[in-house]
Amino acid sequence: MEDFVRQCFNPMIVELAEKAMKEYGEDLKIETNKFAAICTHLEVCFMYSDFHFINEQGESIMVELDDPNALLKHRFEIIEGRDRTMAWTVVNSICNTTGAEKPKFLPDLYDYKENRFIEIGVTRREVHIYYLEKANKIKSENTHIHIFSFTGEEMATKADYTLDEESRARIKTRLFTIRQEMANRGLWDSFVSPKEAKKQLKKDLKSQGQCAGLPTKVSRRTSPALRILEPMWMDSNRTATLRASFLKCPKK
């Protein structure tokens, strides 16, 4: 799984995931499924915000090629991936500027067009189950929830999907590609099932001669949100940098 992640995700996303796991004492060589899940969630957050801007008239537009002469503002503020202190600083600044209610938990994005925080979910299970879990945890009508699955399903608060169909289709296609490439490598079952993940982990460690003394239980604890965001993600060049990660994963 680790090799798969390094092959199929943008190196910057991999680096952010590595830093996040290290910060919280998680070993990516053991928690490989978590490593893949963090990378996937972070990529979806960036794909969600990518290409979307607000023009001088306050209208939401899509721009795939940056025009240095255009006075555009990113429609979405990315909160996911920042260190905790900076993330809350950004949230507080948004609340002070817009009058939005401060969320209890750190959200993933802020939508300047709709003036609301957004929580993004990527699930290997039924979308409605994961949506209810998110809603029960957040317990706030002011944070918009949008859930994607690897099967192309999605669910959002009040069926308001925020993005246009083309943008959402791009995210769904990427998730479906990840699923297919995992399946081609025999990794999908272990990614979905903790029981299968345990078997795969023991098999991998045994083949490396590292099985002794290592845990055999796979943690089901939810990973904390990524806390580190490189400055490059917020500049005008992030579109070009991310574009490489939309490509199909290379096959072995």
Swiss-Prot record:
What family is reported?
A: Belongs to the influenza viruses PA-X family.
Could you tell me what this protein is called? Answer: Protein PA-X
Residues at the site labelled Important for efficient shutoff activity and nuclear localization: K195, K198, K199
Where is the protein found, in the record's own terms?
Host cytoplasm; Host nucleus
Superkingdom to which the source organism belongs = Viruses
Instruction: Provide the GO MF annotations for this entry.
Output: RNA binding
- Gene expressing this chain: PA
Record-annotated active site:
E80, D108
Role played = Plays a major role in the shutoff of the host protein expression by cleaving mRNAs probably via an endonuclease activity. This host shutoff allows the virus to escape from the host antiviral response. Hijacks host RNA splicing machinery to selectively target host RNAs containing introns for destruction. This may explain the preferential degradation of RNAs that have undergone co- or post-transcriptional processing.
What's the record's remark on domains?
The probable endonuclease active site in the N-terminus and the basic amino acid cluster in the C-terminus are important for the shutoff activity. The C-terminus acts as a nuclear localization signal. The C-terminus is recruited to host protein complexes involved in nuclear Pol II RNA processing.
